[in-house]
Amino acid sequence: VDDRSTVQVGVGASITAGNNLVIEALVAVNVDSDANVINGGLVASPNTDATTTLNVTANANLMSNINMRGENITIRAENTKIDAKATANSTVGAAVPIARSESKVTSNTFALVTLDAMEADDAITAQGTLTIIAKQADLSTISTADAEVYGFAGTKSAIANNTQNSTTKITADAQTRLATRSLLVEANSDYLPIINTSASTPGFVLISDDTQDENLTLDQNREIDFFAKVTLLGARSPEIVINEHGLVEKLVNATL
């Protein structure tokens, strides 16, 4: 499975929102491969292979020399849920049974936010809060291989492989210009990802050669390369409206 969600604000773009502005790339993937063989006879040798491969990217790219204005601005790239499974099962009953099962999951996921350079009079301006997030909150990969054999003399082999790679990254150029009263920059991935392998060889064989092999690799990369120029805006201007009777009708950012 190759799945890519990209939102791109082009070079020189100008966007103004009266209230909130959200720019986001979101991806969710659920994939399952299942191989199952049941066999029998005098001499029987079922083989099963189940392979699941994921390449998933959520990418928010703000290109050079853009102007964006809003009350609150959110820029987000997120893989909201990654769920990948591979299940291989071989079952055989024979005088001379030979069963082999191999399952393999390979998951490569990316959540990327990139902010390019801007001219001196360009900026991303949020009057309230500017939020920049790259996130992968729910990562799950499961690989299961079973070779079940019944007979007199035989061989059982179960191999389960599971590789989970995730990269969660925010990059802001040294000439990226931001202005806001509150700034949140977060690159976050699942701190307790599910990554399981299971290889089993159940059954009964009087003379048996069994192989059970489980291989697991987890690589998580969270990174923020943030060199942007940030201007923190001052307190909002007070707004007071008093009617002809001397009564306060509106009071914003001020106390009496």
Please report, for each region that a protein language model flagged, where it lies by residue:
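Low-complexity, glycine- and small/polar-enriched segments
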Residues: 1-256
